[in-house]
Structure formats: structure tokens, C-alpha cells
């Protein structure tokens, strides 16, 4: 893999459900077509020139050294560290990235700081063996069970079945788990049952739900506001009954 260095690693994120975050890889082989906001920003600021370049991840080789310097200074300000907002810590098929991510989790935990992990890859079984923080939480992005949809919009990511299996294994090994259910598709993109999707991951501790933005197909669906209000109600009732913590992202629910 190609490698580069950076001058800093930890930063405070403006994402509404985030705190601090790190992105120890540049690029992502999953090649999401929602479109990918991270890829758009990388192009805008000159880090990449094309989609094809984004698909070739570059590892930040001095990430652990930067954390050694930054964590002691920032420790008292950090509630948790999210991995990651502009890349994937367990990118499908990249063992070198997986190994670094596991080392980073252990490093952050050694400062008694929990991590919040999110992937479209497969959560490794070795997570149960690394240094644990009781507030660590491990998650997958899951907006459908339809593999045709996944192949269209998340072409390089792991299958939905494999993601759920790895998440279930984390749960069964006593780890906290969560789901990022965004961007959730409108029926003109993917006709599906939200309840069926929720039942498949009813064991999780936390769900983030959000509408699909920045896509002409969504805006072309004439009842998109009504649809997302209805889906928000369904997921709210489901989570209340199952005692699952829920965050519905700003802008998902529309006021009449």
C-alpha cells in the first residue's frame, strides 16, 4: 500500500452525533455512489483528482506516533473517538488497514478513552481480544438487505449478510453494537420494508437514522418528506419497544 505522513491526527468533528475523530487512511475502496461526501471534499481540496484515485487507499504511516503525542494533551477534552468519518477503519479486503485500526483502538483505549467504530467492511473477530473499554461501540452501515442495491451504491463494500454476521459476533462476545442507517433510500430507489431491516439487527444497542440527501433520485420522489416522517415514526416505535437508543439526524423529519 502507498503511505503518506500527516502533521496531526485527532480533531473535533462538527458531525451532530460525533465528538473527536481520526482518519488514518486517505481514500476508500468501497467506492460508494450515494454520492460520497468524503470523496467530493477530497477532490475539492486537491487530495485526489478522480474517483479511481479515491478507490486506492493510502495509509497514514505515522498515525500511532501522532496519537502518542496528541492523546496525552487532548485526553481531558475527549468523550470518545469516532473511527472514521472520511474513510473506513475495516476496509473490505485490506489486512494492513485492519491491523493499524486494531492498534489505534488499543492505543486510544490505553488512555481510558472509548472508541465508536463504523464500517462497511467486516468487523474482525479479534476485536474481542484487544484491550477493552466498557464504552467502546462497534457498528456497521446498513440501509438495506438488498444485494442488488448494495452492488449499485456500495460496489466495493462487504455484503450486508457478512456485515450483520460480524456485528452479531461482536454482540455475542459482549461488545456494544450500533447501526448507521443512512442514507436511507426512498422507494423509487429501493422498495423494501424498514421493519424487516430492523428485525435483522434488533440486537443492537444504538441506531442512527437519516434521510438521503444530495441525490436527484430522492428529490424526484414526490412524497419524500412524508415518506421519511413515516419511516422515522416506525423506527422510533421499534426502538422504544426494544429499548434501543436512537438518534434521528437533523433534517430527516419535516414539520408540516
Spans of features found by a protein language model:
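Non-transmembrane, interaction-prone segments in cytosolic or luminal domains
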Residues: 1-5, 9-11, 17, 21-27, ...
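N-terminal [4Fe-4S]-dependent radical SAM core
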Residues: 1-29, 33-80
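Conserved AdoMet/S-adenosylmethionine-binding subsite of the radical SAM
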Residues: 62-234, 238
Amino acid at each position: 500500500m502507498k503511505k503518506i505522513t500527516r502533521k496531526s491526527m485527532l480533531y473535533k468533528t462538527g458531525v451532530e452525533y460525533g465528538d473527536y475523530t481520526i482518519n488514518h487512511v486517505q481514500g476508500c475502496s468501497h467506492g460508494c455512489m450515494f454520492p460520497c461526501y468524503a470523496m467530493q471534499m477530497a477532490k475539492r481540496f486537491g487530495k485526489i483528482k478522480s474517483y479511481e484515485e479515491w478507490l486506492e487507499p493510502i495509509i497514514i504511516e505515522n498515525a500511532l506516533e501522532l496519537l502518542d503525542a496528541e492523546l496525552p494533551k487532548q485526553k481531558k477534552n475527549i468523550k470518545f473517538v469516532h473511527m472514521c468519518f472520511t474513510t473506513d477503519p475495516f476496509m473490505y479486503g485490506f489486512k494492513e488497514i485492519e491491523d493499524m485500526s486494531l492498534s489505534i483502538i488499543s492505543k486510544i483505549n490505553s488512555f481510558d478513552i472509548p472508541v465508536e467504530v463504523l464500517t462497511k467492511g467486516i468487523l474482525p473477530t479479534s476485536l474481542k481480544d484487544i484491550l477493552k473499554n466498557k464504552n467502546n461501540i462497534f457498528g456497521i452501515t446498513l440501509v438495506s438487505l438488498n444485494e442488488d442495491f448494495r452492488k449499485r451504491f456500495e460496489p466495493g463494500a462487504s455484503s450486508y449478510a457478512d456485515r450483520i454476521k460480524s456485528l452479531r459476533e461482536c454482540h455475542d462476545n459482549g461488545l456494544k453494537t450500533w447501526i448507521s442507517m443512512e442514507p436511507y433510500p426512498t422507494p423509487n430507489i429501493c422498495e423494501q420494508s424498514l421493519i424487516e431491516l430492523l428485525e435483522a439487527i434488533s440486537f443492537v444497542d444504538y441506531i442512527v437514522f437519516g434521510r438521503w440527501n444530495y441525490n436527484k433520485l430522492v428529490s424526484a420522489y414526490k412524497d419524500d418528506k412524508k415518506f421519511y416522517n413515516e419511516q422515522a415514526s416506525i423506527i422510533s416505535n421499534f426502538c422504544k419497544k426494544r429499548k434501543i437508543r436512537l438518534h434521528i439526524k437533523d433534517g430527516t423529519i419535516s414539520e408540516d
